[in-house]
Amino acid sequence: MNYLVLKQRIYLVISVLTLIVLGSGYGSCTKFSDRLSDSAMVALDSFHHCQYMALSRGIGYAGRRSEQLDYADQLSRHTTVEQLVEIANTDTSRIARLWAYRILLKKADKQVFDVLKQALKDTTHVELESGCIGSEEPYNRAAIFVYNYDGNELKLSNQLRFSLDSLIFFGYMKNKGFENGLLMDFKPHKIYYATVIEEADKGNDAILPLLAQYKNPNDRQRINKLLKANLKKAGVCSYEACDAISNWNDPAFEWYAKAACQATIKQEDYDAWDILHLLCAYPAPWSYQILKKLLTQKGDYSNSDTAKDYLRERYKTRPVPPIFKPLYDRYVARKK
């Protein structure tokens, strides 16, 4: 064969292959947007104009209605699961990505596990709004907040929920040394226990709520050590300790409840909500006296109403402890 002819044929083959590669690349770039319906594109474009993700429908002190849930409903109805996965993983708007991920959670699709796994690698900041509260969070933590926010409403299989929880526990929180606390409520699975003990023995009081859930008598000394250090550090009742005792009101921890509550009410400004869990966990003369002080407090912004509302709600489904009964009958039951 003539060398020139052979050379021309080689160039022709290379040219054809190049066109095929470029063509397929172009196809992959346009394929996704071409697949989306007009309704889905409108919803997606709406998210692209959002500066924050609205977790709740009402936003701000005035409860201004956010339309983001409407956009989400439209996106959910006009996309497939595969399209939502692609949006959640690749969209240029992190607000749109979070919403696609949230929709996947509500659909309880197992592909949400891989979406969350990828999200945990992203530290770009994004703004979240819920009611009157707003915060700017790294994307990975925002993804955890979205999951936790909808938590009880999600119709996830036990296996999928456990997989997501474990991914967050080991893939984010353990890697971070639990520096931001637990961020969500974990069930006391055996698989977490060794890590929980390891963190507790390091003196990490952020782990207290989960450690208490195991209700292991062998952990009493370990928990008391953490409570003692926590009280010394905080000086008053802390969220971690309060949550731990709410999970396990063992008599061995009553000393903490008493000391923390007494220290808290000595503060010039405190919120009764912070100590009501502890007071009700240990019905005793000391807690009776503090509860009475709260219920009889005067002033426009007193803790009295907070205490009454808390007690009324708490004792809807359980008997009032005998020692609290006179206070309940006088200050709560008669005040409808």
Q: What do these predicted regions represent?
A:
Residues F253, P285-Y288:
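Repeated loop/turn-to-beta-strand initiation elements of outer-membrane beta-barrel proteins
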Residues Q8-R9, A108, K215, N249-D250, ...:
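Short, solvent-exposed helix-helix connector turns and helix-capping sites enriched
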Residues E268, W273-D274, L278-Y282, S302-P319:
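Long, contiguous all-alpha helical interaction modules
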Residues M1-L36:
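Bacterial Sec-dependent N-terminal signal peptides
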